[in-house]
Amino acid sequence: MVISGERAYIYAKICGIIGKSFVGKRVSALGGINRLAELDRIVFPNANRDLPERELLPDLERRTAEKIVREIIGIIKCFKEPPEFLILLIRAYEYADMKAVLSALADRETMSPSWTDIGEFRTVNFEAYPNIEKMLKGTEFEFLLKEDMTDTLSLQTKLDRRYYGAVWNAVLKLPRGDRKGIEKIIGDEISLRNAAWVLRLRTYYNMKPEKIKNMLIFIEGKKTFTDDSLEALNFALDVRSEWTKWKWAAFVREGNIGEYWKIDPRYFQNQASAFLYRSVYHSFKTRPFTLDSVFCFVRLKQSEEDVITSIAEGFGFNITARESLTLLGAI
């Protein structure tokens, strides 16, 4: 494979960032932390935030997100012509922020929810909240203005479908040599999101199968990524043996003899996230100089954000850093 100077420079740059990030073996360094202030000092050694913990938590989460977004954008800007796929990765933050806006509007909140600044890649005028027409004018999100703004769950599903549909189509436009790992990981990610959603809706909301089907991320084409989740609609939630031959059975909690068993959506979600993390880390190590490695860099940084946030929020529930990492499957 002929490696361009641009690709070599970008790969060297992302390796330098990853080497200083809390991913891979460095995640375990967070396990011995006991206090939020200590976590803040490790993540931001040059910062001196003398804040009460209830103020430090949102402050730490905000700075963590801002730092990681800056690093991701810095890499994307290294491309003379960034692929559409990479731009969509950073715009995931905008989609997530739009979900928060829709929830806030449905609850008639007058103050805007916090949002992540993705710089030149941002399209929504979040400063105009709560004027939704002004916020969305000229953006791809204008279609929301014709929807029932009170049906938050349906709107969020439409956003998920729109986002992952755009991502998948952008992946298929990449050269085959660049997308080997991306295609597999994104496909698994969509499939697992659907599966986790089915488990949550069945377990926590007792939602009927026909309604659940309308809440899944369905992508037009040869691969719909709904087969596994549709199959899970038919399994009894309290019979472990019915799940044994399911594609994602390894992520379903085992039961003990004589113990009442029921599907655990949170356990499934954590196991699925750990599986995707391992896939991303392996691909990052084995696919240097490809867009695969850049994609994996983005996912590793986003995983780092999730880990830091989970540990920080866990302290508020008397959950230790090590316990949080164990729940996430990070150690």
Question: Model-flagged regions — what are they?
Answer:
Residues 1-331:
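N-terminal domain-start signal
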